[in-house]
A protein has these predicted regions:
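S-adenosyl-L-methionine
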Residues: 1-14, 29-31
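Conserved SAM-binding loop of SAM-dependent methyltransferases across substrates and taxa
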Residues: 26-38
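Class I SAM-dependent methyltransferase SAM/SAH-binding core
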Residues: 36-61
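Short conserved loop adjoining the S-adenosyl-L-methionine
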Residues: 70-75
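Conserved class I S-adenosyl-L-methionine
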Residues: 15-25
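Rossmann-like AdoMet/SAM-dependent catalytic core
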Residues: 20, 144-200
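A short, conserved alpha-helix within the catalytic core of class I
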Residues: 88-104
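Conserved beta-strand signature within the Rossmann-like core of class I S-adenosyl-L-methionine
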Residues: 109-121
Length: 200
């Protein structure tokens, strides 16, 4: 995914990284990470049996069939943690399907990336609900939404958002690191020629 590549383009390629993916699907993101980074350890998992069967065919990573949401609480240390949620918003992260989310930060990873799909709807539809969750008066744009999310995350675990990559109106890919940082945003339109992906 071109958006994910941009998120991690500033990672030190001369350093070895351990990577943990909790919702690895069929391994698209895992393949990208293997090609981008100097990987010393790579653990991937998915709850779906067909996805797991495909993942385990590639020996570049360790594959497990497990519930990624529960596995977040295992408190394993990895330099980079990837949470490619099939759907998510701040509501899911705080008190919904992915409410174990903050557990990903307990082991103090260098980088945590995740997917947010709230932008499939206009901010006018759910913005008031998101504003309540983030303890702010109102949200008029997704830029404001992610800035408020960054502030919330910093108050919770001492990490903040440094990059948000918008893949058209389908999803946002988020990168957080320790400390308080200025958020950088970039949009990646989907075209007929690449659909937001490139061949490796």
């Amino acid at each position: 995914c071109i958006a994910t590549e941009w998120l991690l383009e500033d990672v030190n390629i001369n350093k070895e990284y351990s990577i943990r993916e909790y919702f690895a699907g069929v391994g698209i993101q895992a393949t990208l990470l293997q090609n981008m980074l100097n990987v010393k350890k790579h653990k991937v998992s998915d709850i779906d049996l067909e996805c797991f069967n495909q993942l385990k065919e590639d020996k570049r990573w360790e594959s497990f069939k497990e519930d990624g949401h529960k596995a977040i609480l295992d408190n394993e240390y990895f330099d980079i943690k990837m949470l490619d949620f099939p759907h998510s918003s701040i509501i899911h992260l705080k008190r919904g399907k992915w409410s174990n989310f903050l557990g990903a930060f307990i082991s103090k990873p260098e980088i945590v990336c995740w997917t947010d799909t709230s932008m499939t709807y206009s901010i006018k539809i759910h913005g008031s609900n998101y504003a309540k969750e983030l303890n702010t008066n109102k949200l008029d744009s997704y830029s404001e939404y992610f800035q408020a999310m960054s502030d919330w995350l910093y108050n919770q675990v001492g990490y903040s958002l440094v990059k948000v990559a918008y893949r058209a109106k389908n999803a946002a890919y988020i990168k957080a690191i320790k400390g308080k940082h200025t958020l950088i945003e970039k949009s990646f339109p989907i075209t007929k020629s690449n659909l937001g992906f490139k061949i490796l």
